[in-house]
Amino acid sequence: MKHWLSPLLEGMEMSKSEHDWLEQRFENMTAKEELLFQGAMQIENPRTVQTTIQILQGLDHYRLLYGADDDVALGRFVMEHIHTPTPAARGYLDPEIVGAAYRDKGAGRFVENHYVERMARNPNLLNIEPDTEAPVVGDYAIRIKLVSRNNMEGVWIGFPDTGEYMDAVHPDELLLGLDALQAETLDQCMAVDADCALPQITDILNQYDSAGELVRHAIDFGYVWAEQGQGEPHWLEKWMCVMELEDCHRLDLALDLAQNLHCYEFIPRGVDLAQYGMDLARKEGVLGQDPLLNQCFDSVAYAQHHMAKYGLSTTDHGYAARNGQEVIYEYSQPEHEPEMTM
């Protein structure tokens, strides 16, 4: 195993399947995952490769406090983001003392100019079954591999970034990626690879002229993925259905469609039409409060009428059609039908 993280496994016995899985996992780690893994290994000090795999599959048990490279910086970070003092108390709190006290109460390590800590006192790593069939890629909606003049091997960055204390515009994944590339801005970087959790989105690199625009859209895509319509039922199915309806294979258009799902009527595939029709009738104010009439209401016919009214098209993820509301394009340029000339 030639990855620079492999010395952390020195002395551990492993099978070929474990070796191969670890090698692939290391190659697919983002810059942030690499730091989390280094910190977790120092915190847990595993003796076996099985425990190491558990750590890799449980990186969400750990978090990184960006730029907290000593007790002073850690104390400042803690007072800014985690334990915020009153303005009156601030002058009587020494950041170094606060940082040391925070370390004493938790389990963490300073790793390459940052602080990595275990989020729970007793992690549930033992409940994670080491699985060499598990994905070798972290739980990201989209990943971009960047290179720079100072780092031609490149690093992965992934979104959404689940960090709790960070700048939403400049998440840790981006900042750590730039640090690893020894680059100050994305203008000094080039995107060389990309993958997306939505199989419809293809050929991502050729959709963008700059790494900066691609990464900005990837960050927003990650937030959209994480929010999932703030818990709206069948939201992801509707998004994928609308993407299929619009023959969407571009990242920018996918972002626009996610923000305009209210412009589409949708029925999930395999849904109970009777229940769907009843819910739809209540939502549209067709049904009143009379239990007898509601019991006799033909909700299947109402759902079928709704489908016919909007001319819903069949896709792999359900039935959808535009409902007449205007689609607002923020990320992409809408395609216009060619005008006829006399």
What is the predicted function of each stretch?
Residues M1-H3, N28, E34-M79, Q230-K283:
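Phosphate/anion-contacting hairpin/loop surfaces
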Residues Y115-R118, N122, R216, F221-W225, ...:
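Repeat-associated, polar segments at repeat-unit boundaries in modular proteins
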Residues M1, N124-E184:
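Short N-terminal edge-element motif at the start of the domain
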Residues D94, D298, S332-M342:
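Non-Sec secretion/translocation targeting segments of pathogen effectors
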